[in-house]
């Protein structure tokens, strides 16, 4: 019975196959146009932020009573990696980090479970705790940010315009979250003179209660008047500052105009919680996000059109500046990636035409676009967009998928030269190479399994690499056995003369080298193993990396002032920096300043910071990569010299998951003071390394507080409680919210506080007049003593242990992993002297890299098992299985050599490339071994079979290697892909050479084939 032949079936149904070929090409072109565009693929931020407030409590009290309860409950979560918390006076912020292996689909249900878990313990918190509140949208991206500035308008007038713009933007199709950034909230201040109201016998709290009672909105009821139901409305609510000024107070049976006891001022919240500037001008920002899954370029076009309408309606003097425009960035990035893809396609096609000739090259030239077209269809169906990873995967796959087409065409040409007719030559492709090619394809795909099954953020980031390469390679095999034979029958001549009767010069040289390697088999094997051993040792000289920095022009400056710094001081330092270094800098396009807060997440890999009055962020957009690094060096030098005591660090954007400062160590233990002391000592260990700079501890310095010791017996005798004193003090210093004025869409707080001259002096506070239970007043100093004390303003914890992180930047191109390796002996010595319960852990880029590589190592056995199973099905021999596997590790020789020569690091992506090399080399090896076995089964002498098979496979293997290597050149210029491209090029070149020389030598050595058999075979042939 004749076995099924897919190539023969295609020739029997030519019209149908042609039809599907045309359909796939048209569908591929349509899908390519419709595919989404992104700069980088999405990955799930597996972080939730929980916040809670306990006004009046110290950082240590909040830690014990609130933070610890939350963290203890969270430890019941199975998918929890760790908790990290920042606690300050009156507030805690807990970061919940899930295990890197948590699947993206399980993240949202986990957030819901956390909400329920914390709800269960809400009753355990002290009285007065507000919250907890949950932010499970920590990964929201605001790709478009606009800054509104004005000349002559008030903040309120400008904010009205921004709010109107926000309403207009919300009508754009696929718009997501839209936030207003840097808007100053209005407030109406009732500023009392404490001496005056004390002299009048007026209690400030009584004034506040009167205002609250008048402004309350309470149900008044309905009246059924015949057929109508009429609502009752009571007037008296405050709608403006004027309505407050007209109030008369009745206190202690006396009437007072409110203006007699308080100065009424309308302004902005003082001090502000956050400020925003564009190019040094006060501004209000509009941060705009897009719904997930939408086409970013289409969204950008719609947003641009809407913003043009918004700008056209703005009054003269209001300017709108584009701060961040992700659609434009993506358009430029995808254009660059696409250009690299077409360059790679051109390189592969040129190689095909040069090596195969015009007609055979034309078959390959049609097959490759067909494979890409079908791949684009699958990408669109799977929701994979065109971005850095998917386009890079297509470029990597190009050099591999051309192999199938070349093998098919080479086989057809060989059969035509042997005298077969065109149809038999075409069908022979399937019978002789289909299953070895399929085995090679599946083995190559299996090499990418560690990427496909890696659930870490890095694995999710690179997941489309696995999908696109797997799809394109499998499609390539289908095209090679289904469409390529039909193309060959149509394009190739019906008969061909042999071009190989006389060997060319290169083929003759190769034959001589092959014979030498096989005759000196053990020398070949020992030399290969020896050089392989040297390459393993050479890996120690290759620098390690997680993900490289971005190739975007932005510079990010994180400002971390001492924790007790005011927002005024943070603003002063940042404004001075802008004036002296940015305002007239010709290398800078524009900059934005965020005081008291960080910038919104304008790209997914941006490291978002929590709001803090002692923190600020400057985002600088330089005029290009050619000046970016120069500007960075200049700015960092100025900051280090000018702002002593401030950690102002200039950094680049990350590609992939953010890591912050590159070199980090954590010191943890049960006692805060001991952890502080140890962290200071460890800072000395890190400081000994000459390549570390801008070292900082994320918390350490204590700050001054005024401790008010209440004389409880005396206070109780006078009818004054600690709560009364705290409320009175807060009303004097920060002010207490009396009520709210409902002004349009805004709620304006009415805040009662002391006059500026009284709230800024400790002496004034000591003389604060307190109302007693008998209606008299006494000074605060009569019932309390004042003293200064040092208190920890911030407490960072990790897994419920006080933890201080020592962070540092790296000078020059040295990678963080290299620094950590060099510090390891000193760190180990330091750890030996630690008390029980204290530890030092590495963090930063090195830890993130380990977290990403851990899942790869866990899945590697599955990859090897899949490869071995596929090969065993094809080879059905342990000996041949060993021979095929033996070549793959030797690619490390080329990998190490290429990385050292190019001074490129072994990053996460380069590791993925090395894993892919295993499949690529095994693919070539299995086809060669199958060819040898096929010739031996036809009766050819073993030695001659090895020689003939190797010489026959030399040309397609060399062509594939050339195509794969040269196709990587366009992406070797990329910061992200460069190390992987160099690693793969080196591995392919060396691995190919060893496949053609080392594998035959190993084969004849393993099967103990005597070298004289070739001579006997040649003699027999001549006879």
PLM segments and residue spans:
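Solvent-exposed, membrane-proximal periplasmic/extracellular interface segments of envelope transport
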Residues: 4-6, 61-136, 195-216, 237, ...
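Signature of alpha-helical transmembrane segments and their immediate interfacial
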Residues: 1-37, 431-433, 499-547, 588-589, ...
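Hydrophobic transmembrane alpha-helices and their membrane-interface caps
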Residues: 27-34, 346-413, 865-953, 958-974, ...
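Solvent-exposed, non-transmembrane alpha-helical starts
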Residues: 19, 58-65, 102-113, 142-146, ...
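Helix-loop junctions and hydrophobic alpha-helical segments within the transmembrane domains
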Residues: 323, 330, 334, 409, ...
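Transmembrane helices with small-residue packing motifs
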Residues: 15, 23-57, 105, 119-128, ...
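Transmembrane alpha-helices and their membrane-interface boundaries in multi-pass membrane transporters
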Residues: 398-412, 433-453, 460-500, 618, ...
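Extracytoplasmic/periplasmic membrane-proximal domains and adjacent transmembrane bundles
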Residues: 9, 51, 122, 168-346, ...
